[in-house]
A protein has these predicted regions:
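ATP-dependent carboxylate-amine ligase
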Residues: 1-38, 43-49, 60-61, 65, ...
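Fold-independent oxyanion-binding glycine-rich loops
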Residues: 8-9, 30-31, 52-53, 68-70, ...
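Phosphate-binding loop of NTP-binding sites
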Residues: 19-23, 43, 56-60, 69, ...
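Beta-strand->loop->alpha-helix junctions that form or flank phosphate-binding loops
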Residues: 50-53, 91-96, 134-138, 233-254, ...
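A general structural signal for well-ordered alpha-helical segments in protein cores
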Residues: 74, 78, 179, 226, ...
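Short acidic-hydrophobic surface loop/beta-edge motif
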Residues: 147, 259-261, 316-321
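Acidic-glycine-rich active-site phosphate/pyrophosphate-binding loop
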Residues: 251-269
Length: 456
C-alpha cells in the first residue's frame, strides 16, 4: 500500500510514518517545512519527502492519505484529496486501526510530563526485555527513534488531548483505547481549541470511558481537576499517588536525584538517576506504577530508571562557555516553567544566578490566557529576558512590570542576545525556555559568550 502523509515532519506524524514503513508500506509525505532532524530521520527510513503542498504530489493517487491535525480546509492537498475521493484518515485513527487494535496500550495523558513519563515507561519495558512499541513526542535518550513497532504486545503512547484532524475534533487520545492509563496532571491548555477547563475535562472523561473494567487508571490524588474528572465516572481499577494514595515518593537529597518509592507505606524501591527536580520524581513514580500493572516489579523498574536518559530539550545542557552554562527546556506553560526553574535551582544550588530567557510561543501563550501567571512562575530566576513575538494580542512588557526581579525584553533576537550577554556574569546559568526553535538563540548565545571578556 502507498501511504502519503500530510504534515509529516511533526513529531507525531513522523512517528506514524516510521511505523507505516515498518509495516512494509511505501510511505511518502509532505510538510510546509521539511527540515532536520525529522527530515533526516525519515529519509534514513526510505521515506520520500516533498516540500510544500502542491497537489501534484497526489498524482498518481496514493492508496491512503493520513492527514495531520495542522491541515485545514483550503490546503491545496486537502482540497485535492476531497475533490478526487482519495481515501483519507486522521493520524490517531490510522494508529488505532493498524497498530493499537490488538495491543496492550499504556497511555500517558496530562498537561505536563507526557513525553518524559512515556519515555520512562518505554525504557523500563525495554530494560526488562519486553521490547515495547511506542510513539513518543520526542526521541527518548535511551532510543534513537521516536516511534517503533516493537516485538511484544505492549505499546507505549504519549496521549495528547489536542484534536485529531479538521474533520475529527475529538482529542487524539480517545482513539488509543488504553488498558493502562497514566493521568499525570490536568490544567487548562490549548486555548486555541478548548473554550475553558471544563471542555478539557470533558475530553478526559471521554478517555476514561474507554478504559476496560480490568484496566488500570493511575492518577495523583492531590490533583483537584483530575479528581473532578474521576468523579464524572470511572469504570476501571484505580491506583493513586500522593500522601493519601497507595504510591508515595520521598526525596533522599534536595535535588531529587535520589528518592525512595513507597507502596502502601512499605519502601519497595530506590532510584538514583541523572535527572533532577520533584516533577521528574513524580513522573518516575507514575512510570513505576504503570510498569507494575503489566508485571514489572518496582525494584526492576527503579533499576531501569537509574539508567534513564531523558528526551532532548528537557533541561538539556547545550554548552558551557567561560564558565557560563546554557540550558534548553521545552517549558511553555507557567506550571512547567516553575517546575523547571525549581529543578535547576536545586541542581546548581542557591549561590549561582539563573538568567531565564522565555519565548511565549505556544498557542495558549500567544492568546495570553496564562500571561498573568508568568511573573510568579519566573520567581526563582535572578534575571528575566522576554522575547516579544509578532502578531500576538498582548505585550510581554505587562509581564515584565509584574516581575519583582530585573527584566528586559525585545522583539529582536539579536538585540535580546546582546542584552543577555551584557548582563551575564561568571558562573551564571542561562535557561532558555520555548516549545519552538527560538530562532537558534542557544547557539547565538554560545557564540556571543565565546567572544565575551568577562569581568568578575
Amino acid at each position: 500500500m502507498r501511504i502519503h502523509i500530510l504534515g509529516i515532519c511533526g513529531t507525531f506524524m513522523g512517528g506514524l510514518a516510521i511505523l507505516a514503513r515498518a509495516l512494509g508500506h511505501d510511505v511518502t509525505g509532505s510538510d510546509a517545512n521539511v527540515y532536520p532532524p525529522m527530515s533526516t530521520l525519515l529519509e534514513q527510513q526510505g521515506i520520500s519527502l516533498t516540500q510544500g503542498y502542491d497537489p501534484q504530489q497526489l498524482n498518481p493517487a496514493p492508496d491512503l492519505v493520513i492527514i495531520g491535525n495542522a491541515m485545514s480546509r483550503g490546503n491545496p492537498c486537502v482540497e485535492a484529496v476531497l475533490e478526487n475521493n482519495i481515501p483519507y484518515v486522521s493520524g490517531p485513527q490510522w494508529l488505532h486501526d493498524f497498530i493499537l487494535r490488538d495491543r496492550w496500550v499504556i497511555a500517558v495523558a496530562g498537561t505536563h510530563g507526557k513525553t518524559t513519563t512515556s519515555g520512562m515507561i518505554a525504557w523500563i519495558l525495554e530494560s526488562c526485555g519486553m521490547a515495547p512499541g511506542f510513539v513518543i513526542g520526542g526521541v527518548p535518550g535511551n532510543f534513537d527513534v521516536s516511534a517503533r513497532l516493537g516485538d511484544s504486545p505492549f505499546f507505549v503512547i504519549e496521549a495528547d488531548e489536542y484534536d485529531s484532524a479538521f474533520f475529527d475534533k475529538r482529542s487524539k487520545f480517545v482513539h488509543y483505547c488504553p488498558r493502562t492509563l497514566v493521568l499525570n496532571n490536568l490544567e487548562f491548555d490549548h486555548a486555541d481549541i478548548f473554550d475553558d477547563l471544563n471542555a478539557v475535562k470533558k475530553q478526559f472523561h471521554h478517555l476514561l470511558r474507554i478504559v476496560p473494567g480490568k484496566g488500570k487508571v493511575i492518577w495523583p490524588e492531590q490533583d483537584h481537576n483530575l479528581r473532578h474528572v474521576i468523579g464524572m465516572g470511572c469504570w476501571s481499577e484505580q491506583e493513586t499517588t500522593g500522601p493519601q494514595g497507595q504510591w508515595l515518593t520521598q526525596k533522599s537529597c534536595s535535588d531529587a536525584s535520589r528518592w525512595t518509592v513507597k507502596l502502601n507505606n512499605d519502601v519497595v524501591a530506590e532510584v538514583e538517576w541523572g535527572l533532577v527536580g520533584e516533577h521528574n520524581m513524580h513522573n518516575g513514580l507514575m512510570a513505576i506504577a504503570a510498569a507494575r500493572h503489566i508485571g514489572i516489579t518496582p525494584q526492576d523498574a527503579a533499576k531501569a530508571l537509574n539508567e534513564f536518559v531523558n528526551a532532548r530539550r528537557r533541561l538539556e545542557l547545550r554548552g558551557t562557555v567561560n564558565g557560563i552554562e546554557v540550558y534548553d527546556d521545552f517549558a511553555h506553560h507557567p506550571t512547567a516553567i516553575l517546575a523547571t526553574l525549581s529543578a535547576l535551582r536545586s541542581k546548581i544550588g542557591g549561590t549561582r544566578r539563573i538568567l531565564a530567557v522565555l519565548e511565549p510561543r505556544s498557542n495558549t501563550m500567544k492568546l495570553g490566557v496564562s500571561k498573568n501567571e508568568l511573573a510568579p512562575s519566573l520567581a526563582r530566576a535572578d534575571e528575566v529576558f522576554l522575547f516579544q513575538p509578532s502578531h500576538i494580542p498582548w505585550q510581554v512588557s505587562d509581564v515584565a512590570e509584574a516581575c519583582v526581579q530585573p527584566v528586559q525584553w525585545s522583539a529582536d533576537i539579536t538585540h535580546l542576545v546582546a542584552m543577555i550577554t551584557k548582563s551575564v556574569k561568571p558562573g551564571d546559568v542561562i535557561l532558555v525556555m520555548s516549545n519552538g526553535g527560538f530562532e537558534g538563540i542557544h547557539q547565538k548565545l554560545l557564540d556571543s559568550l565565546s567572544t565575551l571578556q568577562l569581568v568578575k
